[in-house]
Structures are given as structure tokens and as C-alpha cells.
């Protein structure tokens, strides 16, 4: 992040990353924060209350940008934890895929994408999908997170003008789901209700519909 940059902070509640982004980007920068939970007002931050995985929220953000280039997208998005790690981790992968698929088309070439992600099944597919979209991809665990092996950050630097290889034909979500089918983590055509604890794709939506 640099002075004058435009930043999107996904999963911004309670606002810590957004505050840092405002300080770094300065008066010439722009920071948009989005979260399901309302945040207290933050000077210099445009706040959106909504689900980043839903088209109406995505469309609102694109409308707010009005063509402004986006230099960095940071995501601290996390599922509502159930205490069942396999399910929580699967939904985390699902959410990260959704945010990446929204971010890549609107992120400026040369831009950066940073996201929190839970370790486990599907993470290697996410890393591979990132590598065909960015020139440098690394995992990073801050000191505060190193006592827990479950959480890490994926740091993607220098977005390519165009995705390479399979990235031209498949979304991140499609690729990750395909790799998990091919590796036997999930079975193609498996009922959604049976996917809980195996993969987050569609599970959090199905669970929400049942509530």
C-alpha cells in the first residue's frame, strides 16, 4: 500500500485494517471497507454493509469505484465459527475463492491481494489458482497467529494483466472444486447436505437457507 492508492478492505469489522490503510494511503488515497457487520464510522473510510459473495454488494462496490483503479485488496474474511474445524475450514476456502473471483477482474494490473485463510483441504488449489494470476504468491503467518496452526495469510503480489493457463478458463472456485474432486476429497455430484465437513462450496448457503 502506498500514498494515493485505492484499497478495498473485505471483512473490515471492527476496522483495524481500514484505519491502517487510511494512514498509509493518505489524503489522496481511497479506502472502501465491506462487512456483514456494521462498523463504527472511520475517518476516511467508505463503509459498506453487505455480503461480499452476493452480486448486489459487488455491484455496489463497482458502482462506488466509478472506474477508479484498485491497487490493493485485503481480506480478513472468516466464517461464523461452529467449532467443527473441518466445516469451518471448508467454508473459509469457499469464502476466499469467492473474494478472489470478485477481486481479480477489478484489481489493477500490478496490484496486490492479501487474504486470511484456514489451513487444510483445498488450500493448495487456492495457492495454485493464485499463482496463475499473480507473479509472486507466498504464505505468511504473523507472530500473533503462529501459536495456532489453523490460520495463515496468502500474500499475492503483482497481478498479471491476464491469467495464465487454466486461469483463463476456470474461476478460482471452479478450479479448487475440480482439484478436490480429482483428489477424492469430494465426489462429483455429491449431495450438498453431505458436503459439510468436506468442502465449503455451497454449504454455507445451503445451511443459511435451512435456518
Regions found by a protein language model. Name each.
Residues 1, 25, 65, 106-107:
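A generic alpha-to-beta junction signature in SAM-dependent methyltransferases
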Residues 2-13:
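Conserved class I S-adenosyl-L-methionine
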Residues 5, 29, 111:
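Glycine-centered, small-residue-biased loops immediately flanking beta-strands
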Residues 14-27:
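Conserved SAM-binding loop of SAM-dependent methyltransferases across substrates and taxa
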Residues 28, 36, 62-63, 166-170:
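Class I S-adenosyl-L-methionine-dependent methyltransferase catalytic core
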Residues 34-82:
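S-adenosyl-L-methionine
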Residues 85, 89-91, 95-140:
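Conserved Class I SAM-dependent methyltransferase catalytic core
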Residues 147-211:
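SAM/dcSAM-binding transferase cores
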